[in-house]
Amino acid sequence: MKKGLHPESYRPVVFKDMSNGDMFLSKSTVATKETIEFEGETYPLLKIEISNTSHPFYTGKSTLVDTAGRVDKFMSRYGNRKK
């Protein structure tokens, strides 16, 4: 392998799905200031909005994840209109 090709900061990171609270450990180069205790060790924490544990494609369930209130905003503008 060539030296200096791969990033130095490639390390284990905990990813936390904020829609359902599931966490998993993977390697990443992401920069984060937060840490969390996971399986007896302290790791950097990255909060994500959706993952394979909550995405409708992987779960087979049709759920609506609205983290920014966009659905409510849309429904208040266009949801009550009649043809």
Curated annotation (Swiss-Prot):
| Pfam families, A to Z | Ribosomal_L31
Segment forming the signal sequence: none
Superkingdom as given in the UniProt entry: Bacteria
Assigned keywords, A-Z = Ribonucleoprotein, Ribosomal protein
Which Gene3D superfamilies does the record match to this protein?
Ribosomal protein L31
The terms describing its cellular component in GO are: ribonucleoprotein complex; ribosome
Supply the PANTHER family for this chain: 50S RIBOSOMAL PROTEIN L31, CHLOROPLASTIC (PTHR33280), LARGE RIBOSOMAL SUBUNIT PROTEIN BL31C (PTHR33280:SF1)
Q: How does it assemble?
A: Part of the 50S ribosomal subunit.
What name has this protein been given in UniProt? Large ribosomal subunit protein bL31B
Native organism taxonomy: Bacteria, Pseudomonadati, Bacteroidota, Bacteroidia, Bacteroidales
Give me the gene this protein comes from.
rpmE2
